């Protein structure tokens, strides 16, 4: 063949059955040329010229690569639907064939296991074919040689021996496991019985009825702590009993009471745990859980009451309650665990350890008393139903302690003040007696309507009262001081009631209720000073009274109280100069100064004519005159 003929093998392009709609053509133009504002006549002519000079074969190659992208959207959707329909048909066909096979196998097995085979049969097969209607068997099996039968028999015997050996081993293992389980159960129930015999309440858990629990909490506590007082008694693998406390803290926690005096810690309560030996025993675990729960409830109630006592100076922080006792002393309460005690290196003295321990024991006893009161209220008939929610009052834990400490502080102050006055008067040669009856309101109960312990606690919850009676230097003067402290019901705080018996001054009556120590000291000092003036006048009268065989001397003066509230006495003499003495009294000492007067109320300018004498509480100067001797010498 001299010449070769080349024919292009191009695919035939079928014409479309329908024309594209106008929106489709506009979308195609936008995709190919962009927006219409970018299309101009010049750009179209340039494109036509470029197409004329373009290689047609290159166009065919490009068209082959882009043929898949030019397929119409509707055609692609049709192809997609067709492919999905084919896949669905194939899946349905496979499902039908699998169901046919399942029905065949189920019908075949229904002759030997009808119940199991019936569960996998379709409903149509159950209707058209009864169970066990199809069977299979081997027809004309080939004969087996004698050696094969012998081998099968030997293998069967080996399998039987192996199965017997395995069964024997399983029986021995089961016996060993049963023996250990019996030993574990025996140990578990013995320890449970020991816990019950020691007085603990053993019961089923409310939400886990198959488990046992021990009730170590207090039934009269608040609900949040009452529900935490139940712990499960679990059994370990070896049968040992252990306490599952759930969310309860694993470490021992205790309420610590410290005394802060003059900025430093001067005392701390004993916070060592009570359980020190055999900590791992179940009894000690229960005791530790009970004590920790009790301490947490105690601190919770203390903190709850302390928030209410903010107006009385009580300060609450995150884990601390600070109670003011006096200007120099505060009480600190906080909840600590054993790790905090080991890491606490705060320097402190042990001067007030007894006070801290007493406060700690007191609030523990008061919480137990509150539990008894809850039990008493629960056993009584309930109050009438009401839509209003009943408020749960705060327990009396801090208020009785604060009342006792404040009352003791005020009683010690009054006693110290009267002792100072007594020593001052004794150093001046005056006779004075006072009697102190601290806590006179506390009396042991005589009626046994309630338990003795509760009656004793109720006595300390009542307002505290102490009395001081004093006989003044004069023959008829006396006063009585009653110190009353109440921290439970208003009026709160400590009040002083002073009653006076002074015939020389019948109109003098101090205020019935005094709240400040300075005012009490001023009132008592003033009353004693007035009585000293009365004693001076009585002594002078007894000295100037003439007897039956004697006449009064002209040198004796008669003193009169011109300004008694200023401590001044005046003596008017018809023959000599007039005299005046001024008495000043305080807890630090007694001072008397005499003046010579030209007129009735004019003091002498001559300083040599004035005399003064003072007496201190611890004055032991020999030869110093007493008050009456000094006045007589005037």
UniProtKB/Swiss-Prot annotation:
Biased composition (Polar residues): 611-623
InterPro entries: Mediator_Med17
Gene Ontology biological process terms in this record: regulation of transcription by RNA polymerase II
Coiled-coil stretches noted in the UniProt entry, renumbered to this chain: none
Region (Disordered): 51-73, 606-626
UniProt keyword Transcription regulation, yes or no: yes
Keyword terms of this UniProt record: Activator, Nucleus, Transcription, Transcription regulation
Main location group: nucleus
GO cellular component terms given for this protein: core mediator complex; mediator complex
Keyword set includes Transcription regulation: yes
Family: Belongs to the Mediator complex subunit 17 family.
PANTHER family membership: MEDIATOR OF RNA POLYMERASE II TRANSCRIPTION SUBUNIT 17
Protein name, per record: Mediator of RNA polymerase II transcription subunit 17
Naturally occurring in which organism (per UniProt): Aspergillus terreus (strain NIH 2624 / FGSC A1156)
Gene this protein is translated from: srb4
